[in-house]
């Protein structure tokens, strides 16, 4: 199956008007003693009409559903404070998901760099939406705006990936290198915001550098409603890039394309739109409900 995919790519490269991603240099076939990696195998799947990976869409759908539920619970406590004690009994049960859910989203975004034809465009769109969220949150909540949220992080990671993936590809690193390296980076810098690197305290000179807010260094004056700096969360993105390079090729790709929950997969195809729109919808609905009940 891999051999057929390579032959297909080679034939298409020699034809006129060949898409850019199939032109020479548009894909990498690197062979080591034990490894064959085909970074553009998924381009063949797109040409055959199988660009969507059902299991990834289903996981994204489940994750965005958890985000919607969690934010709804939080918003209800804002509009109806008397309900807070009872609601947060349920909220406490899913509180650990505050780290797990965005972490999985970031991991999936790294995986999907191998599925997108234009990651630069994805990164610029994320940057545009992140800027809009920063502006709106500064108006709605000037004391605690979203200064560097998850969309800021994804935009930065995607743009960094666009700049670095070709030089890294020329090094012929196996997928596990990115997975292990990204995982270690995440683990070593997980408490960086609290002032620790690999369990050791950071020097005082690195504290309170607001211009390095995006990096994740500790800042006691930081007030942000949603904060996902490059360290540690960028480590999960790079781990996802390696995981995608491994899983999104045969034989694993065939299993991931099999859908078990079409409804959840449809939900997962619109995660960005749902993420951008759900809070205004919750706020408007709860405001109307509170107004109706006096």
Residue spans for each PLM region:
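Positively charged N-terminal leader segments that act as targeting/secretion signals
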Residues: 2, 8, 13-28, 32-35
């Amino acid at each position: 199956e891999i051999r057929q995919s390579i032959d297909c790519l080679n034939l298409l490269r020699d034809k006129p008007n060949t898409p850019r991603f199939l032109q020479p240099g548009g894909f990498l076939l690197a062979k080591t003693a034990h490894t064959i990696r085909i970074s553009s195998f998924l381009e063949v799947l797109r040409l055959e009409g199988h660009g969507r990976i059902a299991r990834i869409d289903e996981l994204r759908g489940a994750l965005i559903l958890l985000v919607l539920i969690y934010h709804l619970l939080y918003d209800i406590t804002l509009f109806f404070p008397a309900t807070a004690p009872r609601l947060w009994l349920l909220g406490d049960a899913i509180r650990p998901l505050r780290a797990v859910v965005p972490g999985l989203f970031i991991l999936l975004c790294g995986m999907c760099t191998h599925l997108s034809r234009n990651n630069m465009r994805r990164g610029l769109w994320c940057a545009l939406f992140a800027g809009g969220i920063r502006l709106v949150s500064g108006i709605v909540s000037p004391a605690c705006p979203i200064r560097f949220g998850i969309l800021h992080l994804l935009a930065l990671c995607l743009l960094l990936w666009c700049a670095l993936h070709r030089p890294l590809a020329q090094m012929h690193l196996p997928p596990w290198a990115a997975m292990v390296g990204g995982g270690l980076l995440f683990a070593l810098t997980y408490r960086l915001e609290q002032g620790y690197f690999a369990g050791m305290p950071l020097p005082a000179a690195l504290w309170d550098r607001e211009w390095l807010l995006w990096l994740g260094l500790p800042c006691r004056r930081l007030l942000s409603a949603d904060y996902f700096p490059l360290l540690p969360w960028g480590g999960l993105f790079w781990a996802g890039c390696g995981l995608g390079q491994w899983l999104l090729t045969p034989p694993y790709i065939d299993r991931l394309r099999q859908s078990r929950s079409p409804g959840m997969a449809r939900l997962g195809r619109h995660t960005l739109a749902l993420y951008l729109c759900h809070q205004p919808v919750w706020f408007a609905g709860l405001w109307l409900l509170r107004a109706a009940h006096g």
